[in-house]
A protein has these predicted regions:
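Bacterial N-terminal signal peptides that target proteins for export
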Residues: 2-17
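Short sequence/structural segments immediately N-terminal
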Residues: 3, 25-429
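Bacterial N-terminal signal peptides
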Residues: 14-26
Length: 429
């Protein structure tokens, strides 16, 4: 036998002996381990500062995963002596004041985010009056389960904020008690361009949620003069280009002066129901623009203050453009096609789309009247069709009116005649 064979044989014998030893000794070792007492698992230490007395009754499951996991119970709760043997503290503890020791420093870069601003908000003022329905810190942020705002599981993460606000603002008892004009803001928001962007397109980091418009801790009531939710500058944070146009328009300049007569963004686009102009039901859709503008321009008491005739909407509706829009023509010009959208200016302003020098360009756009003679643009646009207007327009209007009546009458007479003749015909077997 060669030396190599001898070595291999020796290795095989050693491996076999080792395997036999394992098979014989393993059951004995396992049995010994089973009979050996297992030491008790050490109890999980209580969070820092939490007394054993608290843990005897209260679990820490939710607190352990929150931003306040390292805090002690007494950091938030004022522990009063108990009145009986079963409860080591008073049955009802004083409400927690989050701004007493921790959240009291103002946020200098974004004052609205400062929890201290809550005291002057519509919720904080209600709390001072003793109102029991107003939102406290924990109603929005949670109680022991508070998580960072950027955590998707946080109740105040951007995607969850509309639902949190709806707990109160879609509660009809609260709405009626405090005369809140928006009865179903959450349902309206969910159907708006903002709500669809958040929940259908996943744009919670970009599309507006409640706090972007109304504020965070500094939420104001309806009666506030400079209410954030109606301020065009609020919309301008997301729509800076549009706000820049609006700011230089006749409406924007007056709005920034505090003039309450001029339309703000929400007056034309809506509040929680903001929809795309392509949506047929939107107040800014092609067909609905005249009705939206009439909210101001058909009110004599407002128009009189600024020397503007209050018949502008009516005369437009009676014009060829207005009639075509009423019949569903989506390509016909409406108010915004001629006057502008966010850049509306008085007709005497050289930058206005309806300034005399700019009408050829405005009316001659592709899709409207390209190549139209400049002389035609000098004609009056909002022309009265009655006796107060021009004689030519009045005569044409009357001719067309009587022609329409005649055609309608002839159609009715012919229909009745044919129906009578049909009934008189003998029935064929």
């Amino acid at each position: 036998m060669s030396p190599l064979s001898i070595i291999r044989t020796a290795r095989g014998l050693a491996a076999g002996m080792a395997l036999a030893a394992v098979l014989v000794l393993a059951p004995q070792f396992t049995k010994a381990q089973a009979t050996k007492p297992v030491p008790a698992r050490p109890a999980k230490p209580a969070p820092a500062g939490m007394s054993a007395a608290c843990l005897a009754c209260h679990k820490t499951n939710t607190l352990e995963g929150s931003v306040h996991a390292a805090m002690a119970c007494q950091d938030c709760h004022t522990i009063l002596p108990g009145e009986g043997k079963d409860v080591p503290h008073a049955k009802t503890l004083p409400p927690v004041d989050c701004t007493a020791a921790c959240h009291r420093e103002p946020n200098r870069t974004q004052p609205g985010l400062s929890p201290a601003a809550y005291a002057d908000s519509v919720h904080g003022q209600g709390l001072k009056r003793g109102e029991k329905d107003v939102a406290h810190c924990w109603d929005c942020h949670g109680k022991h389960n508070i998580k960072p705002v950027l955590d998707p599981a946080s109740v105040v993460s951007r995607k969850n904020i509309p639902l949190v606000c709806s707990r109160c603002h879609e509660n009809m008892n609260v709405i009626i008690k405090y005369n809140i004009h928006a009865e179903s803001p959450y349902q309206e928001y969910m159907k708006s361009v903002h709500g669809r962007a958040v929940y259908e397109k996943g744009l919670a980091g970009f599309a507006a949620v409640c706090t972007d418009c109304h504020g965070v801790h500094n939420i104001q009531g309806v009666g506030e003069i400079h209410k954030q939710a109606r301020n065009p500058e609020t919309c301008g944070k997301c729509h800076p280009v549009i706000f820049a146009e609006y700011k230089d328009s006749i409406h924007g300049r007056e709005a920034l002066k505090g003039n309450i007569d001029v339309p703000l963004c929400v007056d034309c686009h809506g509040e929680h129901t903001v929809a795309s102009p392509r949506d047929i039901g939107a107040p800014t859709s092609k067909k609905n623009i005249p009705d939206t503008c009439s909210g101001c321009h058909a009110r004599p008491e407002i128009m009189k203050k600024y020397g503007i005739p209050a018949d502008r909407i009516r005369t437009f509706i009676e014009s060829f453009h207005g009639i075509a829009i009423g019949l569903g023509d989506k390509a016909e010009a409406n108010c915004s096609d001629c006057h502008g959208v966010h850049n509306i200016r008085p007709a005497i302003d050289p930058a206005s789309m309806v300034h005399a020098d700019n009408l050829p360009k405005t009316c001659g756009r592709p899709g409207c009247h390209p190549g139209m003679p400049e002389k035609i643009t000098k004609a009056k646009i909002h022309r009265e069709t009655g006796v107060k207007g021009s004689a030519t327009s009045y005569v044409i209007f009357k001719i067309l009116l009587w022609a329409l009546i005649a055609v309608a009458a002839i159609t009715i007479v012919r229909f009745v005649f044919e129906l009578t003749q049909k009934r008189r015909r003998p029935k064929t077997p």
